[in-house]
Amino acid sequence: MTALISQPDLLPPPAPERCPPQQTARLFRETPLLLDCGQVVQDVRVAYHTYGTPSDHAILVLHALTGTSAVHEWWPDFLGEGKPLDPTRDYIVCANVLGGCAGSTGPAELPRVNGEDPPLTLRDMARVGRALLEELGVRRVSVIGASMGGMLAYAWLLECPDLVDRAVIIGAPARHSPWAIGLNTAARNAIRAAPGGEGLKVARQIAMLSYRSPESFALTQSGWGTRRPGTPDITTYLEHQGEKLSTRFCERSYLALTGAMDRFQPTDAELRSIRVPVLVVGISSDVLYPPAEVRTYAGLLPRGQYLELQSPHGHDAFLIDPQGLPEAAAAFLHGA
């Protein structure tokens, strides 16, 4: 099924007083976690947020590369009363991934492999997430994720098929193309060439070019000297984005998470084994994960459906220009 989404969602973000605090769980204290690389990890810390009344069925939100478990901070179009993630109706869980830097166990706390941080996988992250759900008493989930979170949703479908009822995958392929791996390689090389923060700034600038589109930048960054005399607006915009990320993100996490995405290469046969309903959403102007690529993977899923978000703003449209996507996601998540 293909749909063109064009109506904006004008509902306000959730009120601050309804935003819960971050919580922390300590997992794998008795039985250690075996990583795909062969390393054993004991006492894994997982930072997470929950919304709504605890239940044995939850909606599991999977965050993007530099995201956090605080869904209310980055996805107000999706979280709130009357929205796809409705705390008055649903029990919603979002956890910071293993290897990230927003409260969960990070690369510096993991056993090293040949003197380097261990090569984490998305399946490792799914196994940690499963342990958290068991800790919370959750037996079944509907999954929603975008970008890296969408790729992680594929990992959940393959690693935990007994837990997942259905999934919404937004702006994500099942496996990275040479193009996507190349962009990540350039970003990682920038970090390694200039450790200590400067490389991370450049990595973010590279990424931002793939998160938007030529049309988006023409609409929003075509000025000259607006922010700094004699400097193109696109230049100051990219520099600002790099500075912002460098104050809140860890370069080792950036290396670990982009590497995990690149290593996730499920076969077509594995994708055809997924038996639950999956809504796959492409974005019309996405240059990072072109819609034709995303649609191809949807076609491999026996119960896959495909929708396309029409937006000029590229990959990040799921955050900044979701239009009618929240309504479509809500209908799918709740079986309409």
From Swiss-Prot:
Pathway: Amino-acid biosynthesis; L-methionine biosynthesis via de novo pathway; O-acetyl-L-homoserine from L-homoserine: step 1/1. It catalyses: L-homoserine + acetyl-CoA = O-acetyl-L-homoserine + CoA. One of its GO terms (molecular function) is homoserine O-acetyltransferase activity. GO terms for cellular component: cytoplasm. The keyword Acyltransferase applies. Substrate binds at R204, D316. Residues 58-321 form the AB hydrolase-1 domain. The active site is at S147, D286, H315. Belongs to the AB hydrolase superfamily. MetX family. HAMAP family: MetX_acyltransf (MF_00296). Homodimer. PANTHER family: HOMOSERINE O-ACETYLTRANSFERASE. This is Homoserine O-acetyltransferase. It comes from Deinococcus geothermalis (strain DSM 11300 / CIP 105573 / AG-3a).
